[in-house]
């Protein structure tokens, strides 16, 4: 029965805190998505939400292993949600996991996941007393993680810190390679953000749609596949709020301007640092060529 209220995005690809503060009296819960690994000023966000009595749930699908300051992503809000789907920081093909310090919320989550009345066997769950008030009023939606996926994931968790460092090495090579490209806007990252960059984004801000399509086609012809959030129809994983007909929203022109210019690229660990330098060089050449033609 909840009603969704969308909050805008800034040109550094994080939640617009001014817009959040303006809409703070319209909601009780903030589902905060650290999309593509970009973390906002979490100190300011939590101050806004605490003042308004808003519960924060963090979608950390792209920030597992990252930090804001000294706090791991997912530990600011009441709950952190992590994806284990393909291309995420740990990969079991599908599924995910939650972390939470609130016994009642976690008890509800365990029963929702499909524990039936076997919740007492959950070795990471809260005390058994936490289930008494919720066990008969919480439906079972069968979203359990099976032991096979858990066995696939546990060794990856031990390697997470090293994997995060390897992704960031690749990010910095690409970022440096795009540092002086006319018409291309890089994303500024604050010092407090200890990010994990398993993907790379840049902006072709205020470019005509046809020019952006031309850059994508030029790069693809040379083996570099880029994704564009500004396409009128959703493609692959790149959808926008105005595509979600199940969740209507009023227009957000400031966010629309940013979304129109976002270009997105995965940084797989199968790429060597030399590969990343080559990719950056191709993007730089094709963006510069299109910019000069326009």
Task: Outline where the language-model segments fall.
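A short helix-loop-beta submotif of the ANL/AMP-binding
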Residues: 1-5
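Active-site phosphate-binding strand-loop segment of PLP-dependent enzymes
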Residues: 11-92, 97-99, 103-105, 264
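Alpha-helical structural signal in soluble globular domains
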Residues: 23, 44-52, 173-180, 218, ...
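Short beta-strand segments
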Residues: 31-33, 83, 152, 188, ...
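Aromatic/hydrophobic pocket-lining residues that form π-stacking "cages" and hydrophobic walls in ligand
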Residues: 45, 109, 215
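Active-site region of PLP-dependent enzymes
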Residues: 63-69, 76-199
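Conserved PLP-binding active-site segment of the aspartate aminotransferase-like
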Residues: 190, 197-208, 237-249, 259-273
């Amino acid at each position: 029965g909840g009603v969704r209220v969308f909050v805008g995005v800034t040109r550094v690809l994080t939640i617009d805190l001014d817009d959040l503060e303006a809409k703070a009296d319209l909601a009780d819960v903030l589902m905060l998505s650290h999309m593509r690994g970009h973390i906002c000023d979490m100190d300011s966000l939590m101050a806004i939400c605490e003042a308004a009595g808003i519960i924060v749930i963090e979608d950390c699908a792209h920030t597992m292993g990252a930090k804001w300051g000294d706090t791991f992503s997912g530990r600011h809000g009441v709950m952190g949600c992590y994806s284990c789907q393909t291309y995420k920081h740990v990969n079991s093909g599908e599924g995910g996991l939650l972390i939470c310090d609130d016994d009642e919320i976690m008890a509800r989550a365990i029963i929702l996941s499909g524990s039936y009345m076997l919740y007492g066997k959950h070795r990471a769950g809260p005390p058994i007393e936490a289930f008494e008030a919720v066990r008969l009023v919480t439906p079972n939606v069968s979203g359990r993680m099976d032991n096979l996926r858990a066995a696939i994931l546990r060794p990856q968790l031990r390697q997470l810190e090293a994997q995060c460092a390897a992704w960031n090495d690749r990010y910095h090579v690409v970022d440096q390679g795009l540092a002086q490209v006319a018409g291309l806007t890089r994303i500024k990252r604050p010092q407090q953000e200890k990010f994990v960059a398993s993907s790379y984004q840049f902006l072709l801000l205020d470019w005509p749609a046809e020019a952006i399509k031309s850059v994508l086609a030029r790069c693809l012809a040379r083996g570099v596949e880029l994704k564009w959030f500004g396409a009128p129809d959703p493609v692959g994983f790149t959808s926008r709020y105005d595509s979600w007909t199940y969740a209507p929203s009023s227009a957000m022109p400031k966010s629309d301007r940013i979304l129109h210019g976002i270009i997105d690229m995965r940084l797989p660990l199968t790429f060597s640092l030399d590969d990343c330098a080559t990719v950056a060089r191709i993007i730089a050449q094709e963006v510069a060529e299109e910019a000069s033609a326009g």
